[in-house]
Amino acid sequence: MDSAYWSYDNIVPSFRLDGKLVILTGGSGGLAAVVSRALLAKGADVALVDMNLERTQQAARDVLQWGEEQMKGKYESPIGQVSAWSCNIGDAEAVDLTFKAINEHHGKISSVLVNTAGYAENFPAEEYPAKNAENLMKVNGLGSFYVSQAFARPLIQNNMTGSIILIGSMSGTIVNDPQPQCMYNMSKAGVIHLARSLACEWAKYNIRVNTLSPGYILTPLTRNVISGHTEMKTEWESKIPMKRMAEPKEFVGSILYLASESASSYTTGHNLVVDGGYECW
């Protein structure tokens, strides 16, 4: 091998995302709050997408303010742009129009998609309302496909590479007892296999598709759920080998790895589980 092969830039992967546009769905949520800051710190422009425009706009302002306070003087490159968009990812036409508008607004084609949008709800299987089941599958399942499809089309048309990161769940591969979440479990199992299917189809276009499957995360929503329910938190943590729940920041490294073309150029169709060892037991 020649000296170029052994050069620093060739051997040591960069996690910089300078000049790249990242679409982050579920953009006003707890996981997106920390992910968006990390993406901005790595040089990316970030488009936050969520149902509630007002909350998403506030999230965008918060990220930019954080960037101005935390990044000033640390990097030569200017702070990237952060935009906010309202979209129901369960509506294919709305997703397509929104993603086109994002690319036009930023003057570039997005090359990274992080889909954190989705939700869970508890119903005993025999009592699960059909409408609720349909709505959950439309957002978690079809929504994951719609955003992937709208993201990939311009990349394929322009012969560009890209990375799709779909948020799965450990509930996509195991039954997370005792929560009665059969439809959520099914939706996340579908997301994991969707990523594998798209990875195989789009490998010829150099579009990588992976899932990141978290365990229990201490998002603001989760903190509210367990507030005043010490026994619930204790039960959850007893099933985790690391004996604690995860902070949202503990998923940032995994997302940056999957987003980075130099770090994960040969990783596609993979389900990266970050659960503190929960699935080992």
UniProtKB/Swiss-Prot annotation:
Name of one Pfam family that matches: adh_short_C2
PROSITE patterns: ADH_SHORT (PS00061)
Gene3D superfamilies, alphabetized: NAD(P)-binding Rossmann-like Domain
Biochemical pathway: Carbohydrate metabolism; D-arabinitol metabolism
Reactions it catalyzes: D-arabinitol + NAD(+) = D-ribulose + NADH + H(+)
Residues at the catalytic site: 169, 184, 188
Family of the protein in this entry: Belongs to the short-chain dehydrogenases/reductases (SDR) family.
Protein name, entry field: D-arabinitol 2-dehydrogenase [ribulose-forming]
Species of provenance: Candida albicans (strain WO-1)
Highest classification ranks of the organism: Eukaryota, Fungi, Dikarya, Ascomycota, Saccharomycotina
